[in-house]
Swiss-Prot record:
GO cellular component: cytosol
UniProt protein name: Pole-localizer protein TmaR
Entry-linked InterPro entries: DUF496
Subcellular location: Cytoplasm
Family membership noted in the UniProt record: Belongs to the pole-localizer TmaR family.
Coiled-coil region: 13-43, 76-96
Pfam families: DUF496
């Protein structure tokens, strides 16, 4: 019976991670769009149009968004790995439960 509870618990955790993964992928998309926006902005701003400080600020903002994208990609990989581990554990528990039930 404990196996059933663990299977349910693991399945719920897996579903939670799936939702978190989808949310994280949305953040990756959003930040990629911001990076593209800032790249376009850098194409339009010329040194004779504005101060060099503005260029520096925009470049820093772009780098920050790129870092965020990288962080979200890493987090997605970690979440995916956790989900795979949970799926593997659920399969193992299910198999153990089947074997235990078959022996009775």
């Amino acid at each position: 019976m404990n196996t059933v509870f663990e299977i349910v618990s693991q399945a719920r955790r897996k579903n939670k991670l799936k939702r978190e993964l989808l949310d994280n992928e949305k953040k990756v998309r959003d930040n990629r769009k911001r990076v593209e926006l800032l790249e376009n902005l850098l194409d339009y701003i010329k040194p004779n149009m504005s101060q060099d400080e503005i260029m520096t600020i925009i470049k820093n903002m772009k780098a920050d968004y790129e870092d965020r994208v990288d962080d979200h990609i890493i987090k997605s990989a970690e979440i995916s790995k956790a989900r795979r581990d949970i799926s593997r554990r659920i399969r193992e528990l299910t198999e153990e439960d089947k074997q235990a039930s078959g022996k009775k």
